[in-house]
Curated annotation (Swiss-Prot):
PANTHER family the record matches: TRNA N6-ADENOSINE THREONYLCARBAMOYLTRANSFERASE (PTHR11735), TRNA N6-ADENOSINE THREONYLCARBAMOYLTRANSFERASE, MITOCHONDRIAL (PTHR11735:SF6)
Binding locations of Fe cation: H117, H121, D315
Primary role: Required for the formation of a threonylcarbamoyl group on adenosine at position 37 (t(6)A37) in tRNAs that read codons beginning with adenine. Is involved in the transfer of the threonylcarbamoyl moiety of threonylcarbamoyl-AMP (TC-AMP) to the N6 group of A37, together with TsaE and TsaB. TsaD likely plays a direct catalytic role in this reaction.
Leader sequence segment: none
Main location: cytoplasm
Subcellular location: Cytoplasm
Cofactor(s) required for function per UniProt: Fe(2+)
GO MF annotation list: iron ion binding; N(6)-L-threonylcarbamoyladenine synthase activity
Assigned protein family: Belongs to the KAE1 / TsaD family.
Disulfide bonds: none
CC terms in the record's Gene Ontology section: cytoplasm
Protein's name according to its UniProt entry: tRNA N6-adenosine threonylcarbamoyltransferase
């Protein structure tokens, strides 16, 4: 049995300031998890404003760490290490977290472990369910969407991903186009519950192409045109129009994710895992219809389906603390030269996705 380890985790890659304490002994235990969201700060702008997010992180990070330690009933001297998100993400927030972690590590002499934010999501099933490698992971969030085969704490193979917008980003933009509050995921899902998903013939992008790559920007454009068509005809949209638009959009996202997951499972089957498993993580994994569809796809393929509790789907520091423990046990640790990285692909060997931009692959 591995020696028990207790780690502090720090997360500040987007618009959630978070700190947590996780202990790994015979089983993993989350001793505390503090998340200070910034939704109210960004709501007037219809999306996350990087400068506002960075300032909020700088103001709140130390308070979150103090609270996480208090709730865990521990002091810095009771820890075995400090894990921090070192990327990818909005660079101002990531830098704030890395600088705080460096200061704590320097002052206490504790090991410092930089964590890839995506690895935090991808390793969450091992925190919650002690899932064995290898497993198939669908990471689906506001900034990322990709299929990964997780083979180890730092060994991931990407099978495909979104070449443009991530689903969470598309949900947020849909909410903004329809005058719904942010974050868009819960708002669109709630509105879609009373809508007719068959009213609008929205496209299912890239289902006519082989492989596991996806695209969601065209779906967002189709919704914009449908909305504008209603406005041109009626002079505005009714609540039912809005519900139908949300239902049609959500159904299209569900169909794309379900079919691409079938393809990814077929590739993953070649791994011959003792217990085939499909895990899903990221904020969009909290969407009920998406979870239900992926559950059915996994059952059809004879795979176990795992999704973390909703509080661990969205950004949190417990997953960062756990990923730090995993990396530390594998021999990974960092010095004071640890750098904040806006882009940091999990699979360094995979070719950049088409939408990666001039600065390189995001994930």
């Amino acid at each position: 049995m591995s020696h028990p380890l207790t780690f502090l985790g720090i997360e500040s890659s987007c618009d959630d300031t978070a700190a947590a304490v996780v202990r790994a002994a015979e089983r993993a235990e989350i001793l505390s998890s503090v998340v200070d969201g910034q939704a109210a700060l960004h709501a007037p702008f219809g999306g996350v404003v990087p400068e506002i997010a960075a300032r909020a992180h700088a103001e709140r990070l130390d308070l979150c760490v103090e609270r996480a330690l208090q709730e865990a009933g521990l002091g810095l001297g009771d820890l075995d290490g400090i894990a921090v998100t070192a990327g990818p993400g909005l660079i101002g927030g990531v830098l704030s977290g890395v600088m705080l972690a460096k200061g704590l590590a320097a002052g206490t002499g504790l090991p410092l472990v930089g964590v890839n934010h995506l690895a935090g999501h991808a390793l969450t099933p091992r925190l919650t369910d002690a899932l064995a490698f290898p497993y198939l992971m669908l990471l689906v969030s506001g900034g990322h969407c990709q299929f990964l085969i997780a083979r180890g704490a730092e060994a991931f193979s990407r099978l495909g991903g979104s070449i443009d917008d991530a689903p969470g980003e598309a949900f947020d933009k849909t909410a903004k186009l329809l005058g719904l509050p942010q974050p868009g995921g819960p708002s669109v899902e709630a509105e879609a519950a009373t809508g007719d998903p068959r009213r609008f013939a929205f496209p299912r992008p890239m289902l006519d192409r082989p492989g596991c790559d996806m695209s969601f920007s065209g779906l967002k454009t189709a919704l914009l045109r449908a909305r504008d068509g209603i406005v041109a005809e009626k002079g505005g949209i009714t609540r039912q129009d809005r519900a139908d638009l949300c239902a049609g959009f959500q159904a299209a996202v569900v169909d794309v994710l379900a079919e691409k997951t079938r393809r990814a499972l077929a590739i993953y089957a070649e791994e011959q895992a003792p217990v085939p498993a499909l895990a899903v993580a990221g904020g969009v994994a909290a969407n009920g219809p998406i979870r239900a569809a992926l559950t059915r796809v996994a059952e059809e393929a004879g795979a176990r389906f795992l999704a973390p509790p909703l509080r661990l789907c969205t950004d949190n520091a417990a997953m960062i603390a756990w990923a730090g423990i995993e990396r530390f046990r594998a021999g990974g640790r960092d010095g004071m030269d640890l750098q904040a990285r806006p882009r940091w692909p999990l699979d360094q060997s995979a070719p950049a996705l088409i939408g990666s931009g001039r600065k390189g692959a995001k994930a």
